[in-house]
Amino acid sequence: MARFALVLHAHLPYVRAHGMWPFGEETLYEAMAETYLPLIRVLERLRAEGVEAPFTLGITPILAEQLADARIKEGFWAYAKDRLERAQGDYQRYRGTALEASARHQVAFWELTLDHFQRLSGDLVAAFRKAEEGGQVELITSNATHGYSPLLGYDEALWAQIKTGVSTYRRHFAKDPTGFWLPEMAYRPKGPWKPPVEGPPEGVRPGVDELLMRAGIRYTFVDAHLVQGGEPLSPYGEAALGPVESQEATYHVHELESGLRVLARNPETTLQVWSADYGYPGEGLYREFHRKDPLSGLHHWRVTHRKADLAEKAPYDPEAAFAKTEEHARHFVGLLERLAGRHPEGVILSPYDAELFGHWWYEGVAWLEAVLRLLAQNPKVRPVTAREAVQGPAVRTALPEGSWGRGGDHRVWLNEKTLDYWEKVYRAEGAMREAARRGVLPEGVLRQAMRELLLLEASDWPFLMETGQAEAYARERYEEHARAFFHLLKGASPEELRALEERDNPFPEADPRLYLFREA
């Protein structure tokens, strides 16, 4: 029987103590309210009803650190209370109008959010850990701060990202991970490497897979074009493609020379959900993400149609929208059945950014729940975790370099806009290697410098600069972490060190000795 491996990738960059709105902590609070808590509620309902449809959830280390942070928990509680008050105000304003149903829905949603968060004692990480212990999900890890693996300038820098990600996972989930989400599905094989800007030396470098295997990781995921050739898919919101026929290679389990096993993203199921023109989120009944109430900032309108201007958006009808998710779930499972019929021994890998569901596509979590319920009783397709999917026979494969970004290469993260970013990253990585080797700086200073370097390396900063979504914020953030890093190496005062330790506090186990990788 064909196996279906759903993989959700949950990630947000480090925003704790770095602004509130529109690009700071509120972006995390939105994802907590609209994606992570609703997903936990789905898992709680399925567990209570004995519905078995396992899937894989990647929680990046930097996201797990923030979800577990006391400041973030307190901030989220205040945020959700504020949103409830706004919703109540909207309900009073819109009673007797076409927006009343949406306003009533908003009040109920925020009441449920506060009640659920309180019931969990604010511990979302523990809720996901409980779901894994119950066999509902498989939790996997990633690079510590979502560093872009192929472009990090030194093997030691990539090793520190991987190993810190593994140890952070171990602390939160009390076990060692075997699965790994490659940030941006970006991979580089073993071979000659030349830095895109001045800094690191040229030379032959180990493949990303070799370092993953050394860290105890046994499988990961790549985009379809890395195993089948051809054009890469566009990211969500850009694709205007119709159905694409997968080549046979995407249904195989692949094994690299290092022993790492790899699954490839399935194009058909990807486009059905991600495509802006072809996918489910463009349904006219679903809630419009971009139009917000001018007073409350809440959403009360629907997509209406894909080409509608914001002023043309019609009032949102929650009942009709959530009913539509059932229809779309049946359609998706029908697609899986057709693919399974053509590839009865294959693996259908469907990886998505978790935040697409609930945040960008408000009804998306309800759609996921409907899909899981249908799959639990489906005789043609078996839902499995990625760990189960990679078992058994595999095809020996050599992968090219690439990513799931636009063009299938590194252009989103490496371009004219981001050259200064990479120059600062490489300079800091080289300085960190040297400082770790010399061993002169106090342990606390070196440890905090490592945190600042990890935060500097986050792939979010070049991504946001390239897309223009938050270019000024991204530039401010990477420059801030670079300044902090070099100030620490030059000699920060005890007061300055304490201030940085309070502001940038992830990874208590940060180990500067990881930058001695070659001697290890």
Curated annotation (Swiss-Prot):
Result after altering W360A: 0.6% of wild-type enzymatic activity
UniProt-reported outcome of changing L271A: Nearly no effect on enzymatic activity
EC number(s) recorded for this UniProt protein: 2.4.1.18
Dependence of activity on temperature: Optimum temperature is 65 degrees Celsius. Remains fully active following incubation for 1 hour at 80 degrees Celsius.
Active site residues according to the UniProt entry: E184 (nucleophile), D353 (proton donor)
The UniProt record lists the keyword Transferase: yes
Domain of life per record: Bacteria
Result after altering Y236A: Almost complete loss of branching activity but 10-fold increase in hydrolytic activity
Region forming the signal peptide: none
Molecular-function GO terms, alphabetical: 1,4-alpha-glucan branching enzyme activity
UniProt xrefs under SUPFAM superfamilies: Families 57/38 glycoside transferase middle domain (SSF88688), Glycoside hydrolase/deacetylase (SSF88713)
pH-activity profile: Optimum pH is 6.5.
Matching NCBIfam families: branchenz_Thermus
Homology family: Belongs to the glycosyl hydrolase 57 family.
UniProt function note: Catalyzes the formation of branch points in alpha-glucans by cleavage of an alpha-1,4 glycosidic bond and subsequent transfer of the cleaved-off oligosaccharide to a new alpha-1,6 position. The branch chain-length distribution of the reaction products shows degree of polymerization (DP) of 3 to 13, with two local maxima at DP 7 and DP 11. Exhibits an alpha-retaining catalytic mechanism. Is involved in glycogen biosynthesis. Shows a secondary activity, i.e. the hydrolysis of the substrate, being 4% of the total activity.
Official protein name in the record: 1,4-alpha-glucan branching enzyme TTHA1902
Organism: Thermus thermophilus (strain ATCC 27634 / DSM 579 / HB8)
